[in-house]
């Protein structure tokens, strides 16, 4: 029997991320590079480490190899523990055959045995594909204080975007009275962040109930949470007011990277009290040539800059040759940009080679973002 844990986290990291197009052709969405040196999953794992959550199950499925290699034993996030720590949980074969995760609830249900060994009081369920910094221990304190069966972290979103999210309708005490999954006409703009805290006994009971229902899609938002409400369980909304970004599209991923370059951003990566940890790429120092010009940009290790870079994010090992300009763009690891190239409002994928004289910018709508990646 493993050492008993008060709270165990389950991190859903098996998403395909099809709206990210070629960026996720051979890569799980949580492993997509972000912010010059990170992967998207670094934010959730760092939040766990900084919040004192020492046991994290990571549920993977789509294109898991690079993500598994990146996570390793969790030492980058101080989650390599004798008891607990990080455990990668892909789908596995039973006597009846391999069971793929068919939904968010299905993924947790198939790993109830993993949770049971820790006898937790509470289970924290997380998504591995959002950019944010959050102290989960404060949410747990709130959950306990409110004597909730389930607590759901919520954030106010613009009304014109509310139909893209699971929306919570609450009373004055922030108790959830109705949950609507992507409503056409939302009555609230409190959106679910995909962060849940369940009392362990409630989670186990309702996942087993959901698994027995042949009509269920095995999804928390569509099936489990509405059932809990119908049966009178106490669901509380936990309001979050910090930076949070769903980076599920090429444009939203680009926007989140650009947010890092603002003078006053609520996503501060320089906060030594809440570090975002990542795997060290072990690259040499970046080199900026005499005639190069760099403004308002994040330039990571191993970059060689001979041209101009303005308001852009460059990952490790990027080369920008003489006469080239990179403006308002994200250039992912190992990309090579030749001479006299112009790149504007674009994401350049990992290891891409941009030939001399190429011009890359939105052709029709100046507000668009161009993606240049393998498979495009």
Curated annotation (Swiss-Prot):
Function: Involved in the biosynthesis of ADP-glucose, a building block required for the elongation reactions to produce glycogen. Catalyzes the reaction between ATP and alpha-D-glucose 1-phosphate (G1P) to produce pyrophosphate and ADP-Glc.
Catalyzed reactions per annotation: alpha-D-glucose 1-phosphate + ATP + H(+) = ADP-alpha-D-glucose + diphosphate
Protein name stated in the entry: Glucose-1-phosphate adenylyltransferase
Species of provenance: Bacillus cereus (strain ATCC 10987 / NRS 248)
PROSITE patterns per the UniProt record, alphabetical: ADP_GLC_PYROPHOSPH_1 (PS00808), ADP_GLC_PYROPHOSPH_2 (PS00809)
Pfam families named in the record: Hexapep_GlmU, NTP_transferase
GO molecular function: ATP binding; glucose-1-phosphate adenylyltransferase activity
PANTHER family: GLUCOSE-1-PHOSPHATE ADENYLYLTRANSFERASE, GLUCOSE-1-PHOSPHATE ADENYLYLTRANSFERASE-RELATED
Keyword Zinc-finger found: no
Gene3D superfamilies xrefs: Hexapeptide repeat proteins (2.160.10.10), Spore Coat Polysaccharide Biosynthesis Protein SpsA, Chain A (3.90.550.10)
Subunit structure and binding partners: Homotetramer.
Enzyme Commission identifier(s): 2.7.7.27
Source superkingdom: Bacteria
Family: Belongs to the bacterial/plant glucose-1-phosphate adenylyltransferase family.
NCBIfam families, per database record: glgC, PRK05293.1
Alphabetically ordered keywords of this record: ATP-binding, Carbohydrate metabolism, Glycogen biosynthesis, Glycogen metabolism, Nucleotide-binding, Nucleotidyltransferase, Transferase
GO biological process: glycogen biosynthetic process
InterPro entries: ADP-Glc_PPase, ADP_Glu_pyroP_CS, GlgC_bac, GlmU/GlgC-like_hexapep, NTP_transferase_dom, Nucleotide-diphossugar_trans, Trimer_LpxA-like_sf
Binding site for alpha-D-glucose 1-phosphate: 101, 166, 181-182, 192
Pathway noted in the entry: Glycan biosynthesis; glycogen biosynthesis
């Amino acid at each position: 029997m493993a050492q008993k844990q008060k709270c165990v986290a389950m991190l859903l990291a098996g998403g395909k991320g099809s709206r990210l197009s070629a960026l996720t052709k051979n890569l799980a969405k949580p492993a997509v590079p972000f912010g010059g040196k990170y992967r998207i999953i670094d934010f959730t794992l760092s939040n766990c480490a900084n919040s004192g959550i020492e046991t994290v199950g990571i549920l993977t499925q789509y294109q898991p190899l690079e993500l598994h290699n990146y996570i390793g034993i969790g030492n980058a996030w101080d989650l390599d523990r004798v008891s607990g720590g990080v455990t990668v949980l892909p789908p596995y074969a039973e006597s009846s055959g391999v069971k793929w995760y068919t939904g968010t609830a299905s993924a947790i249900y198939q790993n109830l045995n993993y949770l049971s060994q820790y006898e937790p009081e509470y289970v924290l369920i997380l998504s591995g594909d959002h950019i944010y910094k959050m102290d989960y221990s404060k949410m747990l304190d709130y959950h306990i204080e409110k004597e909730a069966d389930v607590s759901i972290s919520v954030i106010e979103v613009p009304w014109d975007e509310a139909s893209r999210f699971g929306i919570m309708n609450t009373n004055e005490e922030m108790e959830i009275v109705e949950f609507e999954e992507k409503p056409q006409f939302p009555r609230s703009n409190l959106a679910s962040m995909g962060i849940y805290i369940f009392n362990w006994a409630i989670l186990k009971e309702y996942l087993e109930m959901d698994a027995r229902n042949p009509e269920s899609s095995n999804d928390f938002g569509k099936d489990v949470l509405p059932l809990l409400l119908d049966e009178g369980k106490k669901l509380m909304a936990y309001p979050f007011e910090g930076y949070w970004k769903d980076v599920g599209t090429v444009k939203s991923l680009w926007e989140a990277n650009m947010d890092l370059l603002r003078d006053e951003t609520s996503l501060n990566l320089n906060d030594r009290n809440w570090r975002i940890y990542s795997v060290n790429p072990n690259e040499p120092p970046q080199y900026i040539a005499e005639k190069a010009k760099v403004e308002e940009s994040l330039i990571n290790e191993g970059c060689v800059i001979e041209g101009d870079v303005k308001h852009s994010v460059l990952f490790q090992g990027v080369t920008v040759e003489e006469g080239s300009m990179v403006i308002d763009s994200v250039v992912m690891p190992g990309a090579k940009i030749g001479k006299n190239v112009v790149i504007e409002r674009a994401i350049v994928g990992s290891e891409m080679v941009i030939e001399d004289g190429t011009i890359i910018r939105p052709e029709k709508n100046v507000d668009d973002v161009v993606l240049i990646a393998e498979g495009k």
